[in-house]
Amino acid sequence: GGGWMRTGETKVGKRSFVGNSGITAPGRKLSKNSLVAVLSSTPKKTKAGANWWGAPPERMRRVTVEVNSPANSGEALTYNPGLAVKAARGVVETMRLLAPMFSAMLLAATLSVYYSLLDALGFPLTWLLSGLVLMGMGAVAMAVTVAVKWICVGKHRAADHPLWSAFVWLNELQDTFVEVVAAPWFFQHTYGSGEINLGLRALGVEIGRGAWIDSYWFPETDLIRVGEAATVGPGTVVQTHLFQDRVMSLDTVTIQDGSTLAAHSVALPASLIGTASTVGPGSLVMRGDRVPTNAVWQGNPIEPWKR
């Protein structure tokens, strides 16, 4: 402030976690075994094992998530993976390079088509047809992304998966195609249109008639329902997973008929926005929250809002 930029050392302690869009400001330290929730900030002072949510931050109760499996003996699938598991993850992570490679191929194909049209038809007709070419490439990008999603993970289901498991890696692989292929070639040009609804439906999102969607951040698509005439604003995240104690927990998110999740808000797993209700911009709908029918809630975390 005041024309000055502040810098400082920031520390995140051992086995601590800062959620998506969480902030640990300059000069602050998050003690070990602690958690800062999505869209939340780290307080000035923290104790080991403390958990925080909201902005300004408040203490939060937390239940430890464990994987009760012989394969996770000695935390082999969470904190202490063996060499074979690391190698397997490395193979899948390397496959994420396929996404930018395919996107580059689409760019090369687009330029090749433009060159052919220019040579055969001249500039005026090429200019008139250029939009159709881009629409065709967008359709190809979307089709490939849908195919990769169904090959990698099939249908998403509510469940818990340790960090060092094939499902988590393959889920990240298909999400890379969403971000690197489908987003620049399709989603980012179709916000608020019927086409984005078609693309999200193909990935598994249940979308009602007349829904207006201005975001493609629907991570585990099959776990999301957007009702008829509902609104999902720009920059919103319908987040169907949480990573806690290095376990990926998946659950449903429901946005009922006529309801609104306003701009730059986040809805966490197991949450529900009731019929004809509104969650204001920049809000955090916590895990398991239920916004009642015909209500207006806002805040981080959300609370009833009197207009």
Identify the function of each model-found stretch.
Residues G1-G54, E58, L200-A202, E206-P304:
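Structural signal for interior beta-strand "rungs" in well-ordered beta-sheet cores
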Residues G49-G204, D289-R307:
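Terminal amphipathic alpha-helical/low-complexity segments used for targeting or macromolecular assembly
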